[in-house]
């Protein structure tokens, strides 16, 4: 019973141990070991071991080295000796001795975690006493602590080597980036190079540099994270203000100094001559490179994520200086850079000489050529110091300024004179002197997009809807010879003031300005009459009168510009001396008013408005001007009286919208749309061709060589025909049977066809109007020529006209004509049945009828649904 309870208890403990976390298992193991120690001490009556067994780790090692272990499973993962995971659970039973089997209680089997430090760390004791096991566990713990100490020392040494390398790289980068010119400061932030920590230089460098405190360590770690996002190499720049050559750039990884002694040695190697500036570049060998001409290393700016950023302009950086700094520095009238050497940290005023008259050359925005063969420079009137400018602005200032003492600048007075005369570059240069400290008086309306657009919109609205006062608009018009004046002055506070007289300026888009530039004695009326030219071309006046107004009444709209001044009546009106006032515009569409030399008002087609003779334009002329010329036949659109607007009936509106919806007409530009390919001459085509035949038959038949030349005498009863001596005018006249004179001529006249004949030259002239090539017309004539005597009868001419139309439709000429074509032009044939073609036509007609029926059905359904809802 006791054994059964113990077995149940052991199983219950094992289940609980399997569910407990690792810390609870360790505590349980420590408690079991303490109980085991107490029982062993009581059994053997031996003093306690000097080795402290109060820690769970020591007891764990002691249990691992015990030899009396039963049912020990093979641990998994023997290669990972330092792992602290569960390598295997073992049941351990440790008897106390030979005589204690009955007196001492049996220890409960507890799961023990076996941790193997290394193969050599396990020591097998020679004695089976608990003291030997504790000693072995203490030895294992001591050995493992030594290994841990060695690893910690290696890690500390590696960390110190990396920190020393970072110190050296930061010192070198700061030295090279202090005077970096032409690039933003973000280009020179030092990055963390990938260094070999096993090199002897890195190991020895830890002896020369003190370890930093914990706070500095944390700050440095944050700085390292920021540096690691950038590139792993830094371009070495010059040391004392000169710009590095693009071909002498060396990565920092190759020339980074190993310790502070190397840094001091490289800094002492820098030497600057007072007469000239030498550029020192840190390359692999440490030699200096002289650059006779400084060049700016242009590298694209990139964000930490790698995106390319457009670098800011140096001029923008100079202009972005805030006003409080400008007020503190003031202006310098000598146009020089004072304290230029203070822009470069670490250099004295003796190293760099003062530069006077330096500036940026301004080019024309039109062609990029310097004005007048001389460079217009911007005198820099600010005395800039390192206290005023930030490092980025200092770098931008040095990059933007060309250090050339020989460059000459223009004084402010000359710039003001050039600006007043209209020199664009001089005006820009004068504007850049004071930056934003410039006041403008007067506007330029044509250079303001919103104002120009508003004026165009108002013109368009006026042309469409009419209204407004013409005199106000014309009084504001600008004369052609107008020359704007711009004055630049200085107020009491020293601020530049630009005054312009271009208020309410409206420029004419005419090209006849040179004609009236020298005439200064023109008043307002003369300035308005000077637009009238002797030319009759309307295009010359479109630009001059594009902003003139016109009014509109109910009958028609009339323009207010005389474009036909060559008319003698209009010239007489212009030369009239009796006109002393203004005559109102006549709104009558059928008549106009004018004033002659005697002062009487007469009804003419002209009217006077502010002294300008104006001809009223009819509605036909205005519509004709807007119409587009085309070769196609313009259809006739029926017009309906708008009686429904007055009566309120809305049924006519639907008829107006759908009146021309289904109307079709013949389009000469697209004849195939109106063509029905039936293969014979239709009745409509035959009637059209017969009209041409009747009009042009019997013409110039006397030109034929076989036509008789004798005069034909006619009976007195045949007076209606009025025959002439020329036989060509005998339009089928028939002689009576009683007349036997000239039988040959009578027989000839009687042998002519009843419909008459047409000369081949006349037919050719008619067919050539189709613009078909002559060889094609010759083929058509050969197909239809049946008489072979230079003439064509009615059937031949009609078929020839039909073939010409077929060629215009795009069809090819057949090798021979089908008999049905000849039958279709016969006057006695009413209809020609073609089963194939007529079936196709009927099919098309049926489809059209079906579509119409479907539309009608849908319309009726919609109406029925609407009635149901109502």
Curated annotation (Swiss-Prot):
Residues 75-86, 184-208, 238-259 have a biased composition (Polar residues). Positive regulator of phosphatidylinositol 4,5-bisphosphate turnover and negatively regulates signaling through the cell integrity pathway. Involved in rDNA silencing. It comes from the Eukaryota. GO terms for cellular component: cytoplasm; plasma membrane. InterPro entries: EF-hand-dom_pair, EH_dom. PROSITE patterns: EH. One of its GO terms (biological process) is lipid metabolic process. PANTHER family: EH DOMAIN, GH06923P. Residues 1-25, 38-57, 62-92, 147-260, 275-315, 516-579, 717-738 are annotated as: Disordered. The gene is IRS4. Belongs to the IRS4 family. Residues 167-181, 228-237, 567-579, 720-730 have a biased composition (Low complexity). Residues 739-828 form the EH domain. Residues 155-166, 209-227, 549-566 have a biased composition (Basic and acidic residues). This is Increased rDNA silencing protein 4.
